[in-house]
Amino acid sequence: MGSGNWIVDNLNSALEMWNGRLAEIWQLISTSPESFKGGGVWNVIVNINDGLKAVGYALLVLFFVMGVVKTCGSFTEMKKPEVAFKCFIRFVLAQAAVSWGMELMTGAFRVAQGMVTTIMDSSGLTAMSATTLPDELVSVIKDVGFIDSIPLWAVTLLGSLFIWVLSLVMILTVYSRFFKLYIATAIVPIPLASFAGQPSSSIGVAFLKSYAAICLEGCVIVLACVIFSAFASSPPAIADDTLAAATIVWNYVGELIFNMLVLVGAIKMSDRIIRELMGLG
């Protein structure tokens, strides 16, 4: 419901956009890929994964032969029981990884999702704290005359634009995490087939590290939201009321946008943060 003041309504509209995206993130971060958007996307990914298993098995043989050729200097060395047994075990394990890659990936995601749920429960938050305009600021804006309100229009438009852009960047980053999960899960038979050969196994190791980082991004995102919620519970203080109304609003909006930038930056860099902290880079 409008307040009857265009400036207040414009700021409230931007904050409603921000609060809505935060609530959506809080819900998305606890959603599994299987139930995301009704599970329709997941069904397509499962079909693609099944189709790529044939390619994975073909690469399995190729990587195995390449590994045997590079690690064994001659056919005589290959005839040694310990060498042949080692190659056989590697091939069997790689074949199992290709066959059960989907189960391995979903299992790893469930572990990470359990960590996210634990962080949410430990924080004591059932939902994100909404960011609202203080009553004092609303009173200052409503008491401004028409001529003096002209600078406020510019400040309000600029601040609202920043808040809208930050909201979109934040939610797009969270959605991109789901897309990365889907892409990694779809192609999992191909990189896991590289474990059949010792020289090519670095491909599989790099893939597993990347997938672990994608799963653990949720922990960083939820921690950033919890920290911001604590900031939101103590909104920026209103500056000296003897200042011009435009200055008071600009100081408030500037501090509010700074807090939002911290959250968006943490969410945007969640992949980099988790790679640096866990050594997954």
Residue ranges with predicted function:
Residues L59-Q95, I187-S201:
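Hydrophobic transmembrane alpha-helix segments characteristic of membrane transport
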Residues Q95-I187, I221, C225-M278:
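Non-cytosolic segments of integral membrane proteins
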Residues I48-V55, F91-Q95, L172, Y182, ...:
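Loop-to-transmembrane-helix entry motif
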Residues I45-K53, F85-I89, L93, K142-F146, ...:
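Alpha-helical membrane-interface segments at transmembrane helix boundaries
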Residues A54-M66, L158, I163, L181:
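Hydrophobic alpha-helical transmembrane segments
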Residues M1-L11, P81-G101, G204-C215, S270:
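Alpha-helical transmembrane segments and their helix-start/interface "positive-inside/aromatic belt" motifs
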Residues L192-K209, I273-G279:
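Alpha-helical transmembrane segments
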Residues M1-L59:
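Binding/recognition "hotspot" determinant
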